[in-house]
Curated annotation (Swiss-Prot):
One of its GO terms (cellular component) is KICSTOR complex. SUPFAM superfamilies: Integrin alpha N-terminal domain, Quinoprotein alcohol dehydrogenase-like. InterPro entries: Integrin_alpha_N, KICSTOR_ITFG2, Quinoprotein_ADH-like_sf, WD40/YVTN_repeat-like_dom_sf. It comes from Bos taurus. Pfam families: Itfg2. It is found in: Lysosome membrane. Disulfide bonds: none annotated. The keyword Repeat applies. As part of the KICSTOR complex functions in the amino acid-sensing branch of the TORC1 signaling pathway. Recruits, in an amino acid-independent manner, the GATOR1 complex to the lysosomal membranes and allows its interaction with GATOR2 and the RAG GTPases. Functions upstream of the RAG GTPases and is required to negatively regulate mTORC1 signaling in absence of amino acids. In absence of the KICSTOR complex mTORC1 is constitutively localized to the lysosome and activated. The KICSTOR complex is also probably involved in the regulation of mTORC1 by glucose. This is KICSTOR complex protein ITFG2. GO terms for biological process: cellular response to amino acid starvation; cellular response to glucose starvation; negative regulation of TORC1 signaling; regulation of TOR signaling.
Length: 532
């Protein structure tokens, strides 16, 4: 297990207290760039944008906000912010700016009156977790709410009017499930036939899969909340629970796999339902395929309280991201390769996803809420690879496209040059020679050579800008503390290579004036333009 360090961090001001699920990332203003939404126990909803430490705008809600989300809950093609309080108040906030930003980049109403929800409705109280997603495969989003009293309810938005600027309608109860254990998290995963399945994690070493088949039953129609309140479920829509002795108590998240989705959608007979990850408070992490196939299990020595998914390598496969109370964060890929990252503060809430912090583009980020009234956003959380490697293996994997910049950088670190770039391995001299070494008589294909051992480089790069200077003796240049005469056919044809020291190739950098023997030339800040 290797450790990484991310240094690109933004500290956001946050003075309230929040529940673990009252934080999320999403595009609240429909500009394709994600923002950070945080709800506190006083009912204040704060939206952070870019790298500004202050909230971009705020919205005042009623009650203690226990969970927030961003999505097209009204199925209008427009994202809204959803905030649900412990008292059962459901809020819709339309935070798309109607006015331009001021000179400092803040919304014009930030310094004046706070934003207000455009819609509010009372639903059953004691909310804990929330999910906005298509759970029945009809192409429309539903709102799924998990409660502290072991109940899960599914709602759908029903329009009561058209043409209004803000939504006009109400939430209609679709289904109520009564479970045997507490609800810890909600997630959606594709089923065997590509139909979404609603997954609920529970204590007692179990999770439940709740089937939503009201669209397939002609006699089943959405009803109002009142008549459905006392029902445990309509016929044809049972809750399917896994036996309690199969899986540990999970906090779960859907783990996206393009290959698995492709197989499920094009192979109707396949029983594969994709991948999902599980974690427990005692530090157990598992990756599951289908309901009974364990791909791998990892045990760590920290108490894990949050589990997310994030593509940190850019290969299209999302990695599992688990966070512990003490700030230890684990990133694990499909092959059980583990990378860890430490935040030096205790954490009370965590989320991961895409956030537009810099350069007006979304990038992978990790968000930590501490007990010291701070929110830390680590942006550009990316890794070239998950597995450990060394520099020689990198060149061996890319013999044709390997950069000579990397080759010379390795040379400066006193590493042997890799075989793909050099025709002959060489022992690098780290001391500065006062005179150029004797070149080989008949090099196979000469545009540059290294000192002492006759290793040849087919396309030496311009001097790295971090070196202190170039030493020149005759027509040979020396970089830093390395004895490496250079020649580059890209700038001007090299001279004839003879037996004597005066027959070295012509200077590869015509923009550099001729210097006398052992005269130091300060290196410019930028590489030579003639060799780019």
């Amino acid at each position: 297990m290797r450790s990484v360090s991310y240094v690109q961090r933004v500290a956001l001001e946050f003075s309230g207290s929040l529940f673990p699920h009252a934080i999320c990332l999403g595009d609240v203003d429909n500009d394709t760039l994600n923002e950070l939404v945080v709800g506190d126990t006083s009912g204040k909803l704060s939206v952070y944008k870019n790298d500004d430490s202050r909230p971009w705008l705020t919205c005042s809600c009623q009650g203690m906000l226990t969970c927030v989300g961003v999505g097209d809950v009204c199925n209008k093609g427009k994202n809204l912010v959803v905030a649900v309080s412990a008292e059962g108040w459901f809020h819709l906030c339309d935070l798309t700016p109607a006015k331009s930003l001021d000179g400092s980049g803040h919304h014009e109403t930030l310094g004046g009156e706070e934003q207000r929800p455009v819609f509010k409705q009372h639903i059953p109280a004691n909310t804990k977790v929330m999910l906005i997603s298509d759970i029945d495969g009809d192409g429309r989003c539903e709102l799924v709410v998990g409660y502290t009293d072991r109940v899960v309810r599914a709602f759908r938005w029903e329009d009561l009017g058209e043409g209004a600027e803000h939504p006009m309608g109400q939430l209609v109860l679709l289904k109520k499930w009564m479970l045997e254990g507490q609800v810890d998290s909600l997630s959606v995963t594709p089923g065997p036939l590509g139909v979404p399945e609603l997954m609920v994690s529970q204590p007692g070493c179990a999770y439940a899969i709740l089937l939503c088949t009201w669209n397939k039953d002609p006699g089943a129609t959405p009803t109002s909340e009142g008549p459905m309140e006392g029902h445990s479920g309509a016929p044809g829509c049972p809750g399917r629970c896994v036996a309690p002795d199969l899986w540990p108590h999970p906090q779960q998240e859907r783990l996206h796999s393009p290959h698995r989705q492709h197989q499920a959608s094009h192979s109707p007979d396949s029983s594969a339902s994709g991948l999902f990850a599980l974690c427990t408070l005692d530090g157990t992490l598992k990756l599951m395929e289908e309901a009974d196939r364990l791909l791998w299990s990892v045990q760590v020595d920290h108490q894990l309280f949050a589990l997310e998914k994030l593509d940190v390598t850019g290969n299209g496969h999302e990695e599992v991201v688990a966070c512990a109370w003490d700030g230890q964060t684990y990133i694990i890929d499909h092959n059980r390769t583990v990378v860890r990252f430490q935040v030096d503060e205790n954490i009370r809430a965590f989320c991961a996803g895409l956030y537009a912090c810099k350069d007006s583009r979304n990038s992978p980020c990790l968000v930590y809420v501490t007990f010291n009234q701070k929110i830390y956003v680590y942006w550009e959380v990316q890794l070239e690879r998950m597995e450990s490697t060394n520099l020689l293996k990198v060149l061996e994997a890319q013999p044709s496209s390997g950069s000579c910049w990397e080759s010379w950088a390795w040379i400066l670190m006193s590493c042997p040059p890799p075989a793909p770039c050099f025709t002959k391995p060489s022992t690098i001299q780290t001391s500065l020679h006062s005179a150029p070494p004797r070149a080989p008589r008949t090099p196979p294909s000469w545009t540059g050579f290294l000192a002492e051992q006759g290793a040849f480089c087919t396309s030496p790069p311009p001097p790295p800008p971090q070196l202190s200077g170039i030493w020149k003796t005759g027509s040979a240049h020396y970089w830093g503390r390395m004895a490496a005469p250079l020649g580059c056919g890209d700038c001007r044809p090299p001279g004839r290579l003879g037996e004597g020291r005066d027959k070295l190739p012509l200077c590869p950098f015509p923009c550099v004036p001729h210097l006398s023997r052992q005269q130091a030339l300060p290196l410019p800040r930028a590489p030579y333009s003639c060799c780019l």
